[in-house]
Regions:
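N-terminal accessory segments
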Residues: 1-23, 255-260, 284
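Short active-site-proximal "capping" loops at secondary-structure junctions
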Residues: 21-25, 38-39, 146
Length: 289
């Protein structure tokens, strides 16, 4: 995908921000706002890879992959680039892994207005892979992603949410490859995928009941240690992702002090990638949840 026009729009001098579908923010007053290229360039089912513009809505990408019976491990909200920028893995992270592992190659524009390619186009080629990982979750402060090559996965033949009142911490180790395990202090939701017979057999073995999709509180996304999860009971409405360390809470995430070593590493990275601070000015990556 040709990113020359995208790079020209970004330029190399004045402050600039990037926006997707405005699901996590929109244009900033007084600052030029750009949008990443849109569209699926190609799908290679035999290689289980796909290339698309970072501005492509995830739902559009899913539709393009449906014909080959594949999908990507990115939640169907917003754009591909937006999900990568905020490292939004979604509630299937337990089974699908973190969203950063989906990226094989990224084409991005740096603070100097140059197009840079990181990573490789196939699953076997991991050249520059660490730089792709660095961009994921950086919220556009190190570079603006223009296009990506993503690893696809087979679309599940069958999936079903189940519920139980069993202790999730005792049940979780006994489950076989659950896609998601959620808990609100009373009810445990379990998402199982696979062959219908295998899913039903596991549900019967653990006494699970078919349930509705869980509704997540929209107040804040907390990151906590697994040992702290029982202490959430009584703190307000929440849904915790068991085995992941993420909690969707009705209240905003508590402010925590940033590790000085982490802060220093971030400053060094920012100084190397964007010395003038022109990319997404005002975005605080360290305080983001």
């Amino acid at each position: 995908m040709d990113l020359s026009e995208f790079a020209e729009e970004i330029g190399s001098e004045t402050p600039v921000s990037i926006a997707g579908l405005a699901t996590r923010g929109g244009p900033v007053d007084g600052i030029q706002t750009v949008m990443a290229p849109v569209g699926v360039e190609w799908v290679q089912p035999e290689e289980m890879t796909v290339r698309c513009g970072a501005g492509t809505p995830v739902e559009e990408l899913d539709d393009a992959l449906a014909a080959s019976g594949q999908c990507v491990a990115i939640p169907p909200t917003g754009t591909v680039g937006g999900a990568l920028a905020v490292a939004h893995s979604g509630i299937r992270r337990l089974g699908y892994g973190p969203v950063r592992d989906t990226v094989l190659q990224a084409g991005y524009v740096n603070a100097g207005g140059e197009v840079v390619k990181a990573g490789g186009p196939t699953v076997k080629n991991v050249s520059g892979f660490d730089l792709c990982r660095l961009l994921v979750g950086s919220r556009g402060t190190l570079g603006f992603i223009g296009d990506v090559i993503l690893r696809t996965r087979p679309r599940a033949a069958y999936e079903q949410w189940f519920t139980t009142t069993a202790d999730p911490f005792e049940l979780f180790p006994r489950l076989y490859r659950p896609t998601s395990v959620l808990w609100d202090g009373v009810t445990t939701w379990i998402l199982l995928e696979g062959h219908p017979r295998d899913v039903d057999e596991q549900a019967t073995r653990h006494g699970l009941t078919i349930g509705e999709n869980p509704i997540l509180p929209s107040g804040g996304r907390w990151s906590i240690r697994p040992a702290e999860l029982p202490g959430l009971v009584g703190t307000g409405d929440f849904v915790a992702e068991i085995g992941v360390g993420v909690v969707h809470h009705a209240d905003p995430a508590p402010v925590r002090a940033v590790d000085p070593a982490v802060a220093e590493l971030h400053r060094r990275l920012k100084r190397e990638f964007d010395p003038t601070g022109r990319l997404n000015p005002g975005v605080d990556v360290l305080s983001a949840t």
